[in-house]
Amino acid sequence: MSKPGAELEEVFSSVQGEGMLIGLRQVFIRFRGCNLTCDYCDTPAGTPAEPCRIEQTPGRRDFVPADNPVSLDRVAALVEGWQRGWPGVHDSISITGGEPLLRHDILMQWLPVLREHLPVYLETNGVMHAALGLVINHVDIIGMDIKIPSTSGCTDLWDDHRQFLEIANTRRAFIKIVVGEETEDWEITRASEIIAGVNRDIPLILQPVTRAGDTLGIKPVKALELQELACRYLAEVRIIPQTHRFMGQL
C-alpha cells in the first residue's frame, strides 16, 4: 500500500540556524499549516492550492515546483540521492513547519522510511503532546518551543508544554524560548520551573527575537539577566540568535 502524500511548503538543504544543532547541515522538510499564530513567525502560510518548492541540488537553491500533496517516494528518493551524491554532508533530517505534528498520521508512516537514511530531528511548538506520543518512537531528537506571551502573543500554554516535555524527555531534547526586551522575569521563571520539574539537565536556549531588518529585539544586558534567572533552575542555559538569518540561509 502506498504511503499518503503530505502538504509541504518546501524541501531543501541548509545549515541549521537555531538550537543545539546550530551549524550542522540538514535536509529540511517543511510541513504546511500550524495550530498557533505567533507574533514573530517568519514562515509563510501557504495554501493547499500552492505548489511545494523542492531543491534539486543540496544548498544550491535550484528549486522546482511540485504539486501538493507531495509523495513520500519523491522525498525519500531525493534524500537517498543526496546521501549518495554528497556522502557525510547531512547530519539529520529536520521535520519542521508550521507545526508538523498536525499531520501525525502522515508522520507515523513517513518517519520510519526517512529514518533509514538519516536521523530525524523534530522541530515543534511543543503543544501537541498527544500527537508526539504517537510518533515519538520514530524521532531521534526534539527541538521544542515554549511560547511565552510577551513575544509570541500566545497564552495559557503552560500545561500543554509541561505534558509535551514529559514525553519529549524520553528522547534527546532541548527547549527554545524566543525572548525580547518586553519579556518579563516571571515568564522565564515559570518556564524554567516547568523544565526543572521534568529534568533540570534539559538544555534551554534563549533566542533573541529577530525584528525587521534582521535586528535583534533585545538589549544584551536584558538577555544576560534572563539567562542568569534561568540558571537558578537549570543546568545549561544558552543565548543563541538565529544565525541562518545572518548567513542568508533559509
From Swiss-Prot:
Cofactor comment text: Binds 1 [4Fe-4S] cluster. The cluster is coordinated with 3 cysteines and an exchangeable S-adenosyl-L-methionine. Binds 1 S-adenosyl-L-methionine per subunit.
InterPro entries recorded: 7-CO-7-deazaguanine_synth-like (IPR024924), Aldolase_TIM (IPR013785), rSAM (IPR007197)
Domain Radical SAM core: 21-250
GO terms for biological process, alphabetical: queuosine biosynthetic process
Molecular-function GO terms, alphabetical: 4 iron, 4 sulfur cluster binding; carbon-nitrogen lyase activity; magnesium ion binding; S-adenosyl-L-methionine binding
Transmembrane intervals: none
Residues reported to bind S-adenosyl-L-methionine: 98
Annotated keywords: 4Fe-4S, Iron, Iron-sulfur, Lyase, Magnesium, Metal-binding, Queuosine biosynthesis, S-adenosyl-L-methionine
Catalytic reaction list: 6-carboxy-5,6,7,8-tetrahydropterin + H(+) = 7-carboxy-7-deazaguanine + NH4(+)
Positions contributing to [4Fe-4S] cluster binding: 34, 38, 41
Entry EC no(s): 4.3.99.3
Record bears the keyword Lyase: yes
Known pathway: Purine metabolism; 7-cyano-7-deazaguanine biosynthesis
Needed co-factor(s): [4Fe-4S] cluster; S-adenosyl-L-methionine; Mg(2+)
Record-listed Mg(2+) binding positions: 43
Residues binding substrate, per UniProt: 15-17, 30, 96
Keyword Iron: yes
Family: Belongs to the radical SAM superfamily. 7-carboxy-7-deazaguanine synthase family.
PANTHER family: 7-CARBOXY-7-DEAZAGUANINE SYNTHASE
Assembly, per entry: Homodimer.
Function recorded in the entry: Catalyzes the complex heterocyclic radical-mediated conversion of 6-carboxy-5,6,7,8-tetrahydropterin (CPH4) to 7-carboxy-7-deazaguanine (CDG), a step common to the biosynthetic pathways of all 7-deazapurine-containing compounds.
Protein's name in the database: 7-carboxy-7-deazaguanine synthase
Organism placement in taxonomy: Bacteria, Pseudomonadati, Thermodesulfobacteriota, Desulfuromonadia, Geobacterales
Gene field: queE
